[in-house]
């Protein structure tokens, strides 16, 4: 069944949730406790995730909690994901919609699968390793290779060079929310491959592997490269943006940042993009990175920033942030609702970052 038809049926079956979002524009709440969990389905990233099936439309949804491990108790992280989504979409970015959800005893964020059964998400890492098979993001010696120029070359290699504008838009979006973790698995393409072509490629790969005596472990990498070349696709909505908006700060630190302007400015200045710059792969402040990109893509950068300036409304941003948890059930608010102080800090961070973004045009 076509994705849009499934989405329409979901609206009919669950009208109250949809009506709530339409009337308020705020994130909805779902209790996914009784949704079936898809077994043996691994998802990448640093947070606890699982794939659950919505019984009302039989569509996969991704449920994520905050990072909770020794030394990194980032309880507000799932809120950062939801706020980033709401703010981004209010500013006209193509951001995946995230809502509030409960799954068993866990509370986190929920997003609908971006692709249909006939499609797949091809993450950036697939393009980068397909372009350069020596690149290994798990090897610290490769960290510095993850640069804007490396991404550009990989896109051009697979004849997707025009999508560099989408990468630039992501960098600009990240500068507004302060996202510091736009790694190779946090952007990608929704791709479609004809099943006959897929099987044909598989046969071709196996024949090549046998002929060239290629190790079995290397076959998958070659198969990915061959598959990518003929595929048609579109740039995926922006997703996995939760590493932002002071999600790592304790309540005590939040208070300090609100009271100390020097500490507040220093915190923003220290924020750097995961996408690096230059031959040395230097990590730059978000705004410094945009300025460097602007030297070669002035029209793209300027047009995007001007577009954001036209739609940016501080009152709308404030309303989103201070009402983000309004749909959270009362019995969960004591443990999971955001404090007014944290909301104020998030608001100030976005306003300050937006003002700095405007200065790029000067």
Stretch-by-stretch model annotation:
Residues 2, 6-8:
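Low-complexity, intrinsically disordered or signal/transmembrane-proximal segments
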Residues 17-134:
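Conserved ATP-binding subdomain of kinase catalytic cores across diverse folds
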Residues 76, 194-362:
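C-terminal catalytic region of ATP-dependent kinase domains
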Residues 114-171, 198-206, 210-217:
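ATP-dependent phospho-/nucleotidyl transfer catalytic cores
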Residues 180:
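Glycine-rich phosphate-binding P-loop
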Residues 183:
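Canonical protein kinase catalytic loop motif
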Residues 187-189:
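Hydrophobic residue at the +6 position relative to the catalytic HRD Asp in the kinase catalytic loop
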